[in-house]
Amino acid sequence: MSTRNELVNLIDETYDVSQIEKEIALDNIALSDLELLATGGYSPLTGFLGKKDYDSVVETLRLVNGSVWSIPITLPVTEEVAESLKAGEEVKLVNAGNVYGVIQIEDIFVPDKEKEALLVYKTTDEAHPGVKKLYERPNVYVGGAIILTKRFENNPFPSYHLDPIETREEFKKRGWKTVVGFQTRNPVHRAHEYIQKSALEIVDGLFLNPLVGETKSDDIPADVRMESYEVLLQNYYPKDRVFLSVFPAAMRYAGPREAIFHALVRKNFGCTHFIVGRDHAGVGDYYGTYEAQEIFTNFTVEELGITPLFFEHSFYCAKCEAMASTKTCPHGKEDHVILSGTKVRELLRNGEVPPSTFSRKEVVEVLIKGLKKEVVTE
């Protein structure tokens, strides 16, 4: 079993694929999963899940060997492709004409997708973006160990795209013994900033790790978000206490289960702590506000290998004249300005400027510019 210090490394760019005839086409999700499997981001996983581990993860949030793992990492193929494959074969993994890796097939099986939806996403509603994607992807899963034979070249954020081994090195170089990870797919607003800085009071460093893989269409584009993080860190954070690097995974929107997954992955990137806020990785009204925090009570910190830090929903209080939460502020709802990424997106899309209690002016400027560009290109 992988401990905090053991990273899986499945990269071999000298691996000869010239004699391998069969291939499996990877969609964008499988491609980003391939990279994270190979770089150790998904340690202790060494490949796409076979049937036993898949069933175990879906039903118990653990691999067969007992390690905590909450999201099934699968390689879907069509029935037609599946018929041409058999266990024991080595097959190329291809995307847009490039061979990125190989899989040693151990298993080919048909999952019960309804069960996967119900247990992983807690709903079979196809309006849920994670469920919709699950049902859209092909119906047969191929399990087996992988090797990454080619790194991605067209990386949109090369200077921020670091492997777990590199972020660990960076934290060590900075002398950080304790590092808190923060997952985001939104621009950082004052509520996030308040939470991050509260956590920074008790640890050595903050690892801001925005997700830049596939997200839903109304999420703010990754390049705009990255620029918003840069201006925020430049103007409002101590440079020697925070490190920005991207998380190239796809967003699953699996709420509580994804919160566990996000914590485990950040442990692999070198974090000792992980921030879990309200409705972490949630979407719509599918999950309770603090369900993503409650799920952590099923596991010990020892078996997770990372300490979750739970935060209440924070807001700007007009009476306190400061950011606060119900833990620190005695005033009523009428004095609270509730901040949410969704609300900020709404204001921006309607051409309104969010107040400074919502977002730093430098961030707002970047977002307005970015959304104007988006409108022009649509």
Curated annotation (Swiss-Prot):
Catalytic activity: sulfate + ATP + H(+) = adenosine 5'-phosphosulfate + diphosphate
Pathway(s) annotated for this protein in UniProt: Sulfur metabolism; hydrogen sulfide biosynthesis; sulfite from sulfate: step 1/3
Enzyme Commission number: 2.7.7.4
Pfam families to which the protein is assigned, alphabetical: ATP-sulfurylase, PUA_2
UniProt-recorded Gene Ontology molecular function terms: ATP binding; sulfate adenylyltransferase (ATP) activity
Keywords for the protein's UniProt record, in alphabetical order: ATP-binding, Nucleotide-binding, Nucleotidyltransferase, Transferase
Signal peptide: none
Any one Gene Ontology BP term: sulfate assimilation
Presence of the UniProt keyword Repeat in the record: no
PANTHER family reported in the protein's UniProt record: PTHR43509, SULFATE ADENYLYLTRANSFERASE (PTHR43509:SF1)
HAMAP family in UniProt: Sulf_adenylyltr (MF_00066)
Family classification: Belongs to the sulfate adenylyltransferase family.
Stated name of the protein: Sulfate adenylyltransferase
Natural source organism: Bacillus thuringiensis (strain Al Hakam)
Phylogenetic placement of the source organism: Bacteria, Bacillati, Bacillota, Bacilli, Bacillales
